[in-house]
Regions:
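A short acidic, often aromatic-flanked loop/helix-cap motif at beta-alpha or helix-coil junctions
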Residues: 34-40, 111-116, 121-122, 153-156
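A glycine-rich, often tryptophan-bearing local segment used as a flexible ligand/cofactor-contacting loop or short
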Residues: 54-139
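Surface-exposed charge patches
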Residues: 18, 73, 156
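A glycine-centered loop/beta-turn motif at secondary-structure junctions
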Residues: 2-5, 22, 30-32, 44, ...
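Charged, low-complexity, helix/coiled-coil-prone segments
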Residues: 8-23, 125-142
Length: 159
């Protein structure tokens, strides 16, 4: 996280947030209600959106992300960073709140992945068995460069 402390967007604290706290320091929790509040301004430099954010059965995050699309665009344009995990359901347009085009195909299960480009983001994959990496899908139609993909070319990590 280059630009300040991170924030996790979710309904309540997650075990995942504790891991971030342990690795990079204090991690702010931003609830969907807080995110969508018109005058809310966080003091974080990075946003983390966990797996399942688009699945209505588990999360109310996607409507809040869509409601704040223009603020997210300004956040990124001013140097903010964002790490978004899989939508967690068969919702191809679940990334439509991003200021660039990203398509998503839900297909949960382990798969072999190949590092296509060396970058700082490959650190996210260190220590995992790349022959059986758990994914909830892959990207279709995207702007950016694939960092890791399946052997048949389906990107699972883009930057």
């Amino acid at each position: 996280m280059k630009n300040g402390s991170p924030a996790v967007i979710w309904e309540d604290r997650l075990m995942f947030q504790r891991l971030i706290d342990d690795c990079v320091g204090c991690c702010e929790l931003v609830t969907p209600q807080l995110l969508a509040a018109p005058f809310y301004r966080g003091s974080f430099g990075a946003l983390i959106i966990p797996t399942g954010f688009a699945n209505k059965e588990y999360s109310r995050v996607l409507p809040a992300l869509r409601a704040t699309k223009s603020r997210i665009k300004r956040f990124l344009e001013s140097g903010g960073e964002i790490l978004v995990f899989g939508g967690g359901g068969d919702i191809p347009d679940c990334y439509d709140w991003l200021p660039f085009s990203v398509g998503y195909h839900f297909e949960y299960g382990p798969r072999e992945i190949v590092i296509r480009k060396e970058s700082d983001t490959t650190n996210l994959l260190e220590g995992y068995d790349l022959s059986a990496f758990e994914c909830d899908g892959y990207f279709t139609g995207y702007q950016g460069d694939p960092v890791a993909s399946t052997p048949d070319g389906h990107p699972i990590l883009i930057e």
